[in-house]
């Protein structure tokens, strides 16, 4: 062929030149030099439109369709056309729901191999996409782009440094985006991947390099699912019906809390926080410990009848210590410790007196006029009467019932009626919080247990909260209603059932309910079920597969305030 031949003739000559002879025109001399160095005949063809050099006629035919717009491969189902036959073949998998690529670790299936490769990064700690501003790494390019859009270091980029070097920034962007290109030896993939029990601590990341082949991935999955593999500790148990977080959890307190006196230092620090907060906090602690003692087989009565180590006689204390040395431990009882019933009544009276009177060392602390002279069991040998901490009838005036009288002369009798308040300490919690917010002495707060089915006052079950929760479907639902009185007249009150507190001011109640979006945050918007706490609410959403919806209800209607 002559040197003045057309370009088409040159292309045909190049394509048909299977012996690898040099082209006389010299236009592709550089490409032929590449063929000579690599030892392969690539049959290079140059595009006239954009100058792209294609490796073969088939590559050139596919590339030229991008300029002409030709799409010869068309789907006969939906009519979508493609430039290559392989794209049409992959498109047919959409209509047939065929997913030939499956993850060897989980049940994920996909239609494309590159999607499977991207999914495998979830099971490993490989993060090949790195931010160019702050060097944070991500597993997907989309996550990295979203981060770069709002990266705080755009104006002042931070140059990351590879591990093992100080003050040596990356030289190019390719190394920054590829963590596998960091300097240093790569760990060997022949060693088995560590199981969860071999990790240093809970939450530690696995090694950054995944196993090399599928067999090692399957072996890792088998080790993780083995019965002997260690797992994370279970979440803390939340007992329903007790005060605490959302009114349904109770802190673990030592069994001697009921016998602890009213501390002077704690009262001084609490007075600075506000008024009757120390007294209310002490009552909460005593009531919470009373619930724990009531759940034991012996009940609260046995726990109150057991004297402390400091109040036991020297003979009983020495005999108990000698029994411990010999390996035999005897439990304290009224007969073994030789404590008289009158001493028990005096101890109980002192405990109840500490609930309503301050410590003797705090006489200089200013108190309201009605609390300057509380009852003291040390000054008076036989006090007239004392109010019981029964939240079913908790009033601040001097009108009491004869059944709720405890004296130091009569023995302490724990009847079924007196045990009824232990499972419903949440009502006492709301009452105590109302006492804290109220500074007037002529306001009476009463708590009534109402039966919703009969709409009348009924007796409360004396079982423990754990027993009541087991038979919740068989028993009737009990509701606590709070009434606030001032000078004999009933006041309007607003109650937040989520936080277990009442408000005497409507504006304060509206501001507080704005935190909960004027709705109950523990009620499912899909089925209407109300959960006891946040943990049960999240478990309900997961197990029932509800779609989260943002529903904002209207605020509650205001009642007429006198």
Swiss-Prot record:
Keyword field contains Secreted: no
Alphabetized UniProt keyword annotations: DNA-binding, Metal-binding, Nucleus, Repeat, Transcription, Transcription regulation, Zinc, Zinc-finger
Tissue specificity of this protein: Expression is strongest in the anterior Fol cells of the oikoplastic epithelium.
Molecular-function GO terms, alphabetical: DNA-binding transcription factor activity, RNA polymerase II-specific; RNA polymerase II transcription regulatory region sequence-specific DNA binding; zinc ion binding
Keyword Zinc-finger: yes
Compositionally biased residues, Low complexity: 307-326
Annotated stretches, region: Disordered: 178-210, 293-342, 361-404, 451-473
Entry GO CC: nucleus
Subcellular location(s) of the protein: Nucleus
Residue ranges, compositional bias (Basic and acidic residues): 369-383
Zinc finger (C2H2-type): 45-67, 73-95, 101-123, 129-152, 494-516, 522-546
Main location: nucleus
Biased composition regions of type Polar residues, renumbered to the chain: 327-336, 456-471
This protein's domain notes: N-terminal zinc-finger domains are similar to the Ikaros clan but may not have the same binding specificity. Key residues involved in binding to the consensus Ikaros target site (5'-GGGA-3'), found in the promoter regions have diverged.
Family listed: Belongs to the Ikaros C2H2-type zinc-finger protein family.
Listed name of the protein: Ikaros family zinc finger protein
């Amino acid at each position: 062929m002559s040197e003045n031949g057309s370009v088409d003739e040159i292309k045909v000559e190049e394509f048909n030149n299977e012996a690898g002879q040099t082209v006389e025109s010299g236009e592709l001399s550089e490409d032929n030099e590449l063929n000579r160095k690599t030892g392969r005949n690539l049959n290079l063809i140059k595009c006239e439109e954009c100058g792209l050099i294609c490796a073969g006629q088939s590559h050139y035919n596919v590339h030229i369709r991008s300029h002409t717009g030709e799409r010869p491969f068309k789907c006969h189902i939906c009519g979508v056309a493609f430039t290559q036959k392989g794209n049409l073949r992959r498109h047919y998998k959409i209509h047939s729901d065929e997913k030939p690529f499956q993850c060897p670790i989980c049940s994920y299936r996909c239609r494309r191999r590159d999607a499977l490769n991207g999914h495998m990064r979830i099971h490993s700690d490989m993060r090949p996409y790195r931010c160019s501003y702050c060097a944070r790494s991500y597993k997907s390019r989309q996550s990295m782009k979203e981060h770069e859009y709002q990266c705080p270091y755009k104006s002042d980029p931070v140059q990351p440094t590879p591990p093992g070097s100080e003050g040596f920034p990356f030289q190019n962007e390719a190394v920054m985006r590829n963590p596998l290109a960091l300097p240093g030896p790569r760990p060997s993939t022949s060693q088995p991947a560590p199981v969860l029990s071999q990790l240093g601590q809970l939450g530690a990341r696995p090694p950054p390099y995944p196993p090399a082949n599928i067999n090692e991935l399957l072996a890792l999955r088998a080790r993780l699912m083995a019965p002997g593999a260690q797992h994370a500790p279970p979440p803390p148990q939340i007992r329903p019906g007790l005060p605490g977080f959302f009114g349904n959890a109770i802190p673990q307190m030592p069994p001697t809390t009921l016998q602890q006196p009213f501390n002077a230092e704690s009262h001084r620090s609490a007075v600075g926080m506000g008024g009757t907060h120390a007294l209310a906090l002490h009552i909460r602690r005593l009531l919470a410990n009373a619930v724990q003692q009531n759940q034991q087989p012996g009940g609260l009565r046995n726990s109150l009848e057991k004297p402390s180590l400091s109040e036991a006689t020297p003979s009983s204390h020495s005999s108990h210590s000698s029994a411990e040395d010999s390996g035999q431990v005897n439990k304290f009882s009224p007969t073994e410790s030789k404590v008289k019933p009158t001493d028990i009544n005096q101890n109980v009276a002192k405990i109840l007196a500490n609930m309503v009177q301050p410590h003797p060392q705090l006489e200089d602390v200013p108190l309201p006029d009605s609390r300057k002279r509380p009852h003291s069991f040390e000054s008076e040998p036989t006090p007239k009467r004392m109010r019981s901490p029964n939240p079913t009838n908790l009033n601040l005036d001097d009108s009491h019932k004869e059944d709720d009288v405890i004296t130091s002369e009569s023995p302490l009798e724990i009847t079924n009626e007196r045990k009824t308040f232990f499972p419903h300490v949440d009502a006492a919690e709301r009452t105590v919080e109302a006492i804290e917010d109220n500074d007037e002495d002529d306001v009476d707060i009463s708590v009534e247990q109402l039966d919703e089915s009969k709409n009348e006052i009924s007796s409360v079950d004396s079982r423990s909260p754990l027993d009541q929760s087991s038979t919740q479907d068989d028993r009737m639902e009990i509701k606590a209603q709070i009434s606030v009185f001032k000078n004999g007249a009933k006041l309007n009150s607003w109650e937040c059932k989520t936080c277990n507190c009442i408000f005497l001011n409507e504006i304060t109640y509206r501001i507080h309910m704005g935190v909960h979006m004027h709705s109950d945050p523990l009620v499912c918007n899909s089925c209407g079920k109300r959960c006891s706490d946040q943990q049960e609410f999240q478990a309900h959403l997961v197990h029932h597969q509800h779609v989260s919806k943002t529903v904002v209800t209207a605020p509650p209607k205001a009642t007429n305030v006198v």
